[in-house]
Amino acid sequence: MSLPQHQNRDAARRAPDDDDDAEEETMANDYREQVQYDGMDDMDRMPSISNNQDIHAQLQAAATPLEFQATLETKFASYDNYCNLFHYILNSEGPVDLEVPNYYWAWDVIDEFIYQFNSFCSYRQKVALKNDNEEEITLLRENPNTWGCYSVLNVLYSLIQRSQISEQLAAMKRGEDAALYAGEYGNRPLYKMLGYFSIIGLLRVHCLLGDFSLALKTLDDIELNKKAMFARVMAAHFTTYYYVGFSYMMMRRYADAIRMFSHILVYVSRTKNFQKNAQYDSITKKNDQMYALVAICVAFHPTRLDDTIHTALREKYGEQFNRLQRGGPDALPLFEELFRTACPKFISPTPPDFDNPEVNIDPVEHHLRIFMDEVKNNMMSPTVKSYLKLYTTMDLKKLAGFLEVEPEKLRCWLLVNKQRNRQTRWSEGGLLERRGDPQQRSRLRHGKEISSTCLRPRSAGDWSTGIFVIWPGHTKARRRASRGRPLF
């Protein structure tokens, strides 16, 4: 047996704490079970419930991917089928009495729903930008609400609310019985599972829309560990950590992003020996995207990586990885190329303007510009560091001369770098929470006023790390006071 095709789009994910071998083996067994699972066979054994519609057939259709070259009419019909299905589930008199085969199926429905939404929005945007197919433009103009952002979000939030899954998860965190908070609908597996995976769906949709903080906020009630339900479905596991990691990256929390990406890559490397051939290509493609994102994050936030990941990075990117770390103008095209390769297919929250195609903005290009602005802000860091390795003290004007920039421009860059340099890491609680003492994102530290730069180690062993510090304006007075003192 093989997995449904839509599960083949994604690969497995891995939760943060992976030291427990027994639980690791449990997750591996779950993975093997999924490899042998055929969702459509289970669907065929589900009881049919009819109320002027065949709910069984609609559930089966909801978990089945469209053909890649599906026509617009087919996509419209698929949207109508989803609307009918979710309307029946959410608005029937009382909960629908339907036993789902397992939680894999519930993920399949939500995953395919969002995938079709994303694909339709991307296709509609492409049609608007090309502006060369009047027939399709007419169809899209006449159906502005089909696969609308509001409709999709409304379904996901409604499933979460109807199932009271947030209340159930909060109760579980407190050590209470979740069933006491589930209500009439939430105690049914159909609603509980759809509600749970709708939370993961919201993470994905908000990230696609570019609201990265809200994307992370949606997971407040879900704990990122191997005991969570999403960790038992490899596609959901992969999706969760990919979008959490990408959201962290776009919020400039690179340490947290590296942590999320690393756990996925390590997990996939440990399970690849029993991955089926049907999934291999998809997993390989997603792995390449992950490694590209790790390479980007490490360029911004140098850190020690797992040996498996570090070796794979060197094999995949080699000299490109070195160019990213060196920075400078020559690295800009490489950053852009890797971002295009690894980023999600961003979408716009509103339909494009078919009457004025010149005002339409490609969402991917929009987020690429935002990302490249951050790259340019950090572009000089490696170069500055290389100069400061040669000097104990350097005047700001002298450093600006080496960099061939105006002193005031360099001062502005240093101030921006100072503002973005310190960050705290996520350890527990909501993903947006920052706990612990702020840490240096890089080894560049600043004073309140920038007039000169100094290279000083924090300890005897730190000389090799190239730590450099921007000291305040009274550095000269300190130097004058230290004249004549012995060096050691």
Curated annotation (Swiss-Prot):
Residues 7-16, 431-440 have a biased composition (Basic and acidic residues). It comes from the Eukaryota. GO terms for cellular component: eukaryotic 43S preinitiation complex; eukaryotic 48S preinitiation complex; eukaryotic translation initiation factor 3 complex. GO terms for biological process: formation of cytoplasmic translation initiation complex; translational initiation. One of its GO terms (molecular function) is translation initiation factor activity. InterPro entries: eIF3l (IPR019382), PCI_dom (IPR000717). Residues 17-27 have a biased composition (Acidic residues). Coiled coil: none annotated. Residues 256-450 form the PCI domain. PROSITE patterns: PCI (PS50250). It is found in: Cytoplasm. Residues 1-34, 427-449 are annotated as: Disordered. Keywords: Cytoplasm, Initiation factor, Protein biosynthesis. Component of the eukaryotic translation initiation factor 3 (eIF-3) complex. Belongs to the eIF-3 subunit L family. Component of the eukaryotic translation initiation factor 3 (eIF-3) complex, which is involved in protein synthesis of a specialized repertoire of mRNAs and, together with other initiation factors, stimulates binding of mRNA and methionyl-tRNAi to the 40S ribosome. The eIF-3 complex specifically targets and initiates translation of a subset of mRNAs involved in cell proliferation. This is Eukaryotic translation initiation factor 3 subunit L.
